[in-house]
Structures are given as structure tokens and as C-alpha cells.
UniProtKB/Swiss-Prot annotation:
Residues 1-25 have a biased composition (Low complexity). It is a multi-pass membrane protein. SUPFAM superfamilies: Mitochondrial carrier. Coiled coil: none annotated. Belongs to the mitochondrial carrier (TC 2.A.29) family. It comes from Dictyostelium discoideum. Residues 1-26 are annotated as: Disordered. Keywords: Membrane, Mitochondrion, Mitochondrion inner membrane, Repeat, Transmembrane, Transmembrane helix, Transport. It is found in: Mitochondrion inner membrane. The gene is mcfH. Its main location: mitochondrion. This is Mitochondrial substrate carrier family protein H. Solcar repeats lie at residues 29-121, 132-243, 259-360. It comes from the Eukaryota. GO terms for biological process: import into the mitochondrion.
Length: 366
């Protein structure tokens, strides 16, 4: 009896070890598939929606200059598209696409892969529908976004500044021409070759002025914006996908079932739109903080004044007060239309492409 018991235990241990090894093997296989899916989806969405991101950044930062009235540089989204196309050329709409792609590859890989594995890990603790649909996406989405945003923050800083630099250069040109032309308008002056954006110079200036930590300028507001966005998005996506599948296609749909491309597309676009609308005010503040990285410290300032200057420009409260006092509540909604127009298709393209590649490749392996 004892011998049989020992043999049974050994057999069970061997089976468990075999299952564990198989699971580890599947995890390594799936990591590669998830990485391919997330990278491909991220690249596709970046190339398609970058023009909308450029317009959003311009609208959010056009009032950051001083000394002359910049309120009518761009009157709205369509006006921004027209003026940028007319005065700067169509390629300007893809300004920042290189740092955007550099950011997309590690960000999408870390974000989606982390989300998938955190989700599978959290599923072990409960198997109720409410837990799987609401709690798991909220927690997994939050943790995955914190990790990916922290890693890619320097690339986000570069992308934001490369898209907004033209506006501030145009402002400098306008000031120089103001004495000879009373009709000079910001956004209508062509840039000189010397004013092309230099990413290395930006990083060097930031490090020289505020140290290496300056490359993570805006990370706080980015997390404040992206963490709730991620939680809202994933919870909304999972809930909507679940409801659409059960009502339209499969009443017995579960988390392990496949969902078709168009269901993922609709759920991604809808949840992305909701999350974008709710987090736009934070996005405006984050953009202002990151654009302030271009401001250099005056050598005439004392060390304490320099420290105060840096703290002020890194403060979300300071920029919030500035926006409210100079632009009112509407200032917090600047760039809402292009942001939603960018985020909605980006979320739809990203998640539907990701799910399609993930499901097809993992299914092939199985």
C-alpha cells in the first residue's frame, strides 16, 4: 500500500512537472506571438493616426508663447489641418513619426504582452464573470500601463517636442518680422533650415539643465492620464466585447472564446473614445509640461531661482492654474476632437490587429 502510494505520488509529480514544463514552453512561444502582434498593430496605428496627433499637439500648445496674441493661430481642428498643409507641407503631418515608432515598438510590446500575462495570472484567483470582465481588466491594464509608460517616457518627451517645435519656431520668426510687417501671423512663416528639430540637442539641453531625470519630465501627468485611460479602456473593451458577442453571435461566449475582427474593432473604438474624452484635460496639462522642456534656464538666475523655475514647470497644478486663468475651462478641452479622432481608430486598429494575429498564431501552435 505504502509503495503504491509513493508510486502514485511520484507519477502525479511527474505529470505536474510535465504540465509545468509544457506551460512554460507555451508561455515562451506565446510571448513571441504576442510581441509580433503588438508590434505590428502598434506600427499600423502609429502611421495612420500620427497626423491627428500632430494637430492635437499644435492645438494644445499654441498658447504657450508670450508677448503677442497667439489665440487665433489655429481656430480649430480643420483650420489647423489647412494651415499646416498650406504653410508647412503634407510631410509635416508625420513630424514625430520616427520617435513615435521608436516608442511604439517597446511600448506596445511591453504593454500588450504584460496585459495578457497579468490577465491570465489574475484569472487564477476567481472564475466569476464579474471578476473576469471588470476587475481583471482594471488591474491588469493599470499595472501594464505603469510599466510601459515608465520605460518609454523619454521617447514620449521627444515625440511631443518634435511635433510642437514648429509652432515655437514660427513664433520666433513672427517676432523678428513684426517690426516690418504688421500683418505677420504665427503659423504662416516658413521655417529656416537651421530651425529643424534636433532630438540629440533636445536631450543634451534637458540633461544639462535639469539632469538625467529631466528625460522623464511629464511622466507623472502621463501616468495620471494613461493609467485611468488604460483602466477605462480595457474594462470597457472587455465588457462591450462580451455583450456584443453574446447578443449578436454566441450566447455561450466566454473569455476563452475567439471574437471576430469587426467585434474587436467596434469594442476597441468605442471604449477608446470614452477613455479619450474623460482624460483629455490631463493630456493638455501633460503636453504643456513636456513642451516646457524646451525652455532654457537664464544664466542670470541664482541656483535657487533655477530650482524654483524647474519645479514650477514640472508642476501640474501650476499649468492647470495657467490654463484656467488665461484660457478658461475650454483650455482643458483643447485638442479634444483630434485626440478622439486619433485615439478611437488607433485603439480599434491596434486591438483588432493584435487579437487577430494573436488568435491565429496561437491557434496554429495548438
Amino acid at each position: 500500500m505504502l509503495s503504491n502510494s509513493v508510486n502514485n505520488n511520484n507519477n502525479n509529480n511527474n505529470i505536474n512537472n510535465s504540465n509545468s514544463n509544457n506551460n512554460d514552453s507555451n508561455i515562451h512561444k506565446n510571448v513571441k506571438k504576442l510581441m509580433v502582434a503588438s508590434i505590428f498593430g502598434g506600427i499600423m496605428s502609429s502611421l495612420i493616426v500620427t497626423p491627428l496627433d500632430v494637430v492635437k499637439t499644435r492645438l494644445q500648445t499654441q498658447n504657450t508663447g508670450s508677448h503677442i496674441n497667439q489665440k487665433h493661430v489655429f481656430k480649430g481642428t480643420l483650420d489647423a489641418f489647412k494651415k499646416i498643409y498650406k504653410n508647412e507641407g503634407p510631410l509635416t503631418f508625420w513630424r514625430g513619426v520616427t520617435p513615435s515608432l521608436l516608442m511604439t515598438i517597446p511600448s506596445a510590446t511591453i504593454y500588450f504582452t504584460s496585459y495578457e500575462y497579468l490577465k491570465e495570472y489574475l484569472y487564477q484567483f476567481n472564475d466569476t464573470e464579474a471578476y473576469n470582465i471588470y476587475t481583471v481588466p482594471l488591474v491588469a491594464g493599470t499595472l501594464a500601463r505603469i510599466f510601459s509608460a515608465s520605460v518609454t517616457s523619454p521617447f514620449e518627451l521627444l515625440r511631443t517636442n518634435s511635433q510642437g517645435i514648429v509652432l515655437q519656431n514660427a513664433y520666433k520668426n513672427t517676432v523678428a518680422m513684426a517690426a516690418s510687417s504688421s500683418t505677420a501671423t504665427i503659423g504662416t512663416i516658413p521655417l529656416s533650415s537651421e530651425q529643424r528639430f534636433n532630438s540629440f540637442k533636445l536631450y543634451r539641453d534637458i540633461v544639462n539643465n535639469v539632469g538625467i531625470k529631466g528625460l522623464w519630465r511629464g511622466l507623472g501627468p502621463t501616468l495620471v492620464r494613461d493609467v485611468p485611460f488604460s483602466a477605462i479602456y480595457w474594462a470597457g473593451y472587455e465588457v462591450l466585447k462580451n455583450k456584443l458577442m453574446k447578443s449578436q453571435i454566441d450566447p455561450n461566449f466566454s473569455r476563452n472564446s475567439k471574437s471576430p475582427f469587426f467585434i474587436n474593432f467596434i469594442a476597441g473604438a468605442t471604449s477608446g473614445t470614452l477613455a479619450a474624452v474623460l482624460t483629455t484635460p490631463i493630456d493638455v496639462i501633460k503636453t504643456r509640461i513636456q513642451m516646457s522642456a524646451q525652455q532654457t534656464l537664464s544664466p542670470s538666475l541664482t541656483p535657487q531661482q533655477q530650482l524654483d523655475f524647474i519645479k514650477k514647470n514640472n508642476s501640474s497644478i501650476y499649468h492647470l492654474k495657467q490654463i484656467l486663468s488665461q484660457e478658461g475651462w475650454k483650455g482643458l478641452t483643447k485638442g479634444l476632437v483630434p485626440r478622439v479622432a486619433k485615439v478611437s481608430p488607433a485603439c480599434a486598429i491596434m486591438i483588432s490587429t493584435f487579437e487577430y494575429i494573436k488568435q491565429s498564431h496561437i491557434a496554429d501552435d495548438n
